[in-house]
Amino acid sequence: IDDVLAMATRPVVMSHGGVKGTCDKTRNLSDDHLRRIAATGGVIGIGYWDEAVCGNDVHAIVAAIRYAVSVAGVDHVGLGSDFDGVITAPFDTSGLAEITQELQSQGMPGVDIAKIMGGNTLRVLRECLPGS
């Protein structure tokens, strides 16, 4: 990630992973990485599996999301599902509402939840894809 960030001229998307601030695993991003991705205008996709969030439930996922928001800002955090069958997630796509509900129950404003649940990723795609 350091090499990518050193040469990035457009928003960097970390499609799926975790953050060391809530789950100190080798693959997860440091606070410095979070800030540097945000500085590119990019998005950090928070994953749903144990190695990414150190848990197998919506609470661990939301803790990682909230931590990333606290470091990178709400405009730079999104979902990183990785629903490809390789990882074990606590739910399938029908369970995404659980993330929304948990963010709401913790007092996050609806406009911020909308950004995390897809708005930030759409913003980057619109900025970066041809014809946008």
Predicted feature residues:
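Active-site-proximal loop/turn and secondary-structure-junction residues that shape catalytic pockets
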Residues: 8, 18-19, 48-50, 83-85
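A conserved active-site cap/scaffold subdomain adjacent to cofactor or substrate pockets
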Residues: 38-53
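Conserved, mostly hydrophobic/aromatic
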Residues: 16, 44, 82, 113, ...
